């Protein structure tokens, strides 16, 4: 008799996705981040659910309800900090996952890649709205500044902003709708992640060499289940070290002050994982130009498959492209640092140069490097 996991309609889906899935025999630890993102998402949904049981989305009570969770709810403090720092872990895994895709040419799986970009944008929107919910100073002013960017859209801009606000400023209506969206979006992310996996399993995984691995595939279980469990343990260890020893390391002290529309904080800045995009936004003196650059800094990922000029898929055997990739990583770290600095000399010019470099590397230098490598190998 055939095993039930291969015949049962539901178990068959799980079996083909996580047990009998043929996987390349040589995928490295960079392939662990997909499963880690799944774990992060489940963790965020669970901790978020328990926080929502005690949170009140009213401007007069939001800040107090978060304080109440930390002080009076059983283990409320650990749930709150696991949720806040879980978001940071989520973005670390996301950046690693996208970086892996760029380095090893996984973006040639077009549907998988494009759904991944949509997932990234949805996750960024979710994180932004979540940051508004505690209704601290940085929550309020962050919401005001970022939503205000839409007013740069010609003709309909201001109407659009007031429609999103639900009034003439960030107020009760804004907080309530942000809570509603912040609650529903993770479930949409989960659904999109399933579609992401569906398209991935149509082609099978890429591998570090970029060479088709059909001739040498191994079952996902037990080889990669055990590898993913190791990754999960390291992820949870890192998260709990953050939560239990330095829970406020990545937060902003200003958010421990209740929101006050009459008092602007000296430096308005988002959470660390948005700083690179924030630096690109600030580096352009024109409002509409900055907004366009902000959107393009993420949407440029959609263009990456079109800019692939190399005859090889992966960067494993392409040293010049490797140099370009790591310069891009250094540039993104520079932008992240600049995003957290005040708008003054020399940070302004450093931010502008780093922003120009970011677009230049992706749009010009990487395709040129690939063409040079093709010519060196006489692969016209």
From Swiss-Prot:
Binds 2 heme b groups non-covalently. Disulfide bonds: none annotated. GO terms for molecular function: metal ion binding; ubiquinol-cytochrome-c reductase activity. SUPFAM superfamilies: a domain/subunit of cytochrome bc1 complex (Ubiquinol-cytochrome c reductase) (SSF81648), Transmembrane di-heme cytochromes (SSF81342). Heme b b566 binds at residues 97, 196. Its main location: mitochondrion. Keywords: Electron transport, Heme, Iron, Membrane, Metal-binding, Mitochondrion, Mitochondrion inner membrane, Respiratory chain, Transmembrane, Transmembrane helix, Transport, Ubiquinone. Gene3D superfamilies: Cytochrome Bc1 Complex, Chain C. Component of the ubiquinol-cytochrome c reductase complex (complex III or cytochrome b-c1 complex) that is part of the mitochondrial respiratory chain. The b-c1 complex mediates electron transfer from ubiquinol to cytochrome c. Contributes to the generation of a proton gradient across the mitochondrial membrane that is then used for ATP synthesis. Belongs to the cytochrome b family. The cytochrome bc1 complex contains 11 subunits: 3 respiratory subunits (MT-CYB, CYC1 and UQCRFS1), 2 core proteins (UQCRC1 and UQCRC2) and 6 low-molecular weight proteins (UQCRH/QCR6, UQCRB/QCR7, UQCRQ/QCR8, UQCR10/QCR9, UQCR11/QCR10 and a cleavage product of UQCRFS1). This cytochrome bc1 complex then forms a dimer. Heme 1 (or BL or b562) is low-potential and absorbs at about 562 nm, and heme 2 (or BH or b566) is high-potential and absorbs at about 566 nm. This is Cytochrome b. It comes from Rupicapra pyrenaica (Pyrenean chamois). The gene is MT-CYB.
């Amino acid at each position: 008799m055939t095993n039930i996991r291969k015949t049962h309609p539901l178990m068959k889906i799980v079996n083909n996705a996580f047990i009998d899935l043929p996987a390349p025999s040589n995928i490295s630890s960079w392939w662990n981040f997909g499963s880690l993102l799944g774990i992060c998402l489940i963790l965020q949904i669970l901790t978020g659910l328990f926080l929502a049981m005690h949170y009140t989305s009213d401007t007069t009570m939001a800040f107090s309800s978060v304080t109440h969770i930390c002080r009076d709810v059983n283990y409320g403090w650990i749930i709150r900090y696991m949720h806040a720092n879980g978001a940071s872990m989520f973005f670390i895994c996301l950046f690693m996952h996208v970086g892996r895709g760029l380095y090893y040419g996984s973006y040639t799986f077009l549907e998988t890649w494009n759904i991944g970009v949509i997932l990234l944008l949805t996750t960024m929107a979710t994180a932004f709205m979540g940051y508004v919910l505690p209704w601290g100073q940085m929550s309020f002013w962050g919401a005001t500044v970022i939503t205000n960017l839409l007013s740069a859209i010609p003709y309909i801009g201001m109407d659009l902003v007031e429609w999103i606000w639900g009034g003439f400023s960030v107020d009760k209506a804004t907080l309530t709708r942000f809570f509603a969206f912040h609650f529903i979006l993770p479930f949409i992310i989960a659904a999109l992640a399933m579609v992401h996996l569906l398209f991935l399993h149509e082609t099978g995984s890429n591998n570090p060499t970029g060479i088709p691995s059909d001739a040498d595939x191994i079952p996902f279980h037990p080889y990669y289940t055990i590898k993913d469990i190791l990754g999960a343990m390291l992820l949870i260890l890192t998260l709990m070290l953050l939560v239990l020893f330095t829970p406020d390391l990545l937060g902003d002290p200003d958010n421990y002050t209740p929101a006050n529309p009459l008092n602007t904080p000296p430096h308005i800045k988002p959470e660390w994982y948005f700083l690179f995009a924030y630096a690109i936004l600030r580096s352009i003196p024109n409002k509409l130009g900055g907004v366009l650059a902000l959107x393009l800094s993420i949407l440029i990922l959609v263009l990456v498959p079109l800019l692939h000029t190399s005859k090889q898929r992966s960067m494993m055997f392409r040293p010049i492209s490797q140099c370009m990739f790591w310069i891009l990583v250094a540039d993104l770290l520079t932008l992240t640092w600049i995003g957290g600095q005040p708008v003054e000399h020399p940070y302004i010019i450093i931010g502008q140069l780093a922003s120009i470099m970011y677009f230049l590397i992706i749009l010009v230098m990487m395709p040129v490097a690939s063409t040079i490598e093709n010519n060196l190998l006489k692969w016209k």
